[in-house]
């Protein structure tokens, strides 16, 4: 049980770091989000959020 909790916490921390890396694509240059999604998932990248530049999401075209 303890191992399961440690694995879940580790995965949550890793996914949080990944999302923070993706978020920087929109804050620096919105075109970076699109390039990131094209290279990693062959999808279109779209920046969104309260200010329009807080989160990068990949979507199928």
UniProtKB/Swiss-Prot annotation:
- Please state where this protein is localized: Secreted
Establish whether keyword NADP is in the entry.
Answer: no
**Tissue expression notes:** Expressed by the venom gland.
- Please list the residues that make up the propeptide: 20-22
Extract one GO BP annotation from the record.
Answer: defense response to bacterium
Query: Does the keyword Oxidoreductase belong to this entry?
Result: no
The signal peptide stretch is 1-19
Cite a GO CC annotation: extracellular region
SS bond partners: 26-47, 33-56, 37-58
What keywords are assigned to this protein? Antibiotic, Antimicrobial, Defensin, Disulfide bond, Secreted, Signal
What does the record give as the function of this protein?
Antibacterial protein.
Family in the record? Belongs to the invertebrate defensin family.
Q: What is this protein called?
A: Defensin-like peptide TXKs2
Species annotation: Olivierus martensii (Manchurian scorpion)
Question: What broad taxonomic lineage does this protein's source fall under?
Answer: Eukaryota, Metazoa, Ecdysozoa, Arthropoda, Chelicerata
